[in-house]
């Protein structure tokens, strides 16, 4: 269902940061470090992560255009495909997003017939969500397009370095997860 993506070729916008480092010293990327204080906006980690997030969204929407599903919605569908009958709080923890946002996403997906909600057996106040047959079909069909977006995002990184890149992102999240507005705590982590 994804449209064929036009691949743009462009020259690098940003050059790698290469500051002179005195012999026997390591680069200091701490906030108070000299190198960090001299970094322009486009070289700061937070700015770069935000920009990479924008690029990921653009790639996702380009590859998955025919499905009319957002990355957060696809994350929720994927979560329910491996963990059916989750309540709103569990979904929020799995995705690392706010409960209120989960309720909104569940409502949108329910109106499209991709998920269904039912009352919990143990706690009747709890509503559990699961994929409908149509939700399962869309989630499965979207996988190839989503995977293509991920591959395009990582394309500039040599294959031998991709694991290290992902590992570094995980370390940053693990080390700072407690500082987020919501806590990301997936079952499989």
Kindly label every feature range from the protein language model:
Residues 6, 57, 85, 107-174:
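Charged, amphipathic alpha-helical coiled-coil/dimerization segments
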Residues 1-67, 189:
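N-terminal leader segment of winged-helix/HTH proteins
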Residues 24, 97-100, 119:
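Short linear motifs centered on Gly/Pro in flexible linkers and helix caps
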Residues 40, 47-50, 54-101, 112, ...:
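N-terminal helix-turn-helix DNA-binding core of bacterial DNA-binding proteins
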